[in-house]
């Protein structure tokens, strides 16, 4: 069965973005860019691939489906991108967008848990939960694995990785890797 994987970057204090969805403060070194391109190419938006030496049609390695909330979708939309990950099936969970004018992006206005349960039953690669924090909190019971890119920076405020009710949920670390600037990636599975 497919897994729902929350693959996300965050600050040391647990924020996935700063004010106004800013992620520019994360220190991403060349070694990490190379790792992302080799191991998780599908997590890099289609429009930036040519600018970082990655073929637009580079094959997906882990995920073929993406679920994101409005806060994750809006930055691309603000620069005219209606399909930021054209190389994947894309779902945007939002009750406030109204409609999406792109047939390759499906709007889900209710029941994200039901969506994930249906997708898990389908054949295919794993499902990438890209954010944001509110959606991740709604889907916490369905998250099978966390892949946390922990950057060596404190944000102070912003969008929390999980913005919901108090809900202690155990995950067990299975692997960790570190990059030259101190950024760490930790894989955790539901305990």
Locations of regions flagged by a protein language model:
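Enzymes that bind and transform nitrogen-containing heteroaromatic metabolites
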Residues: 1-191
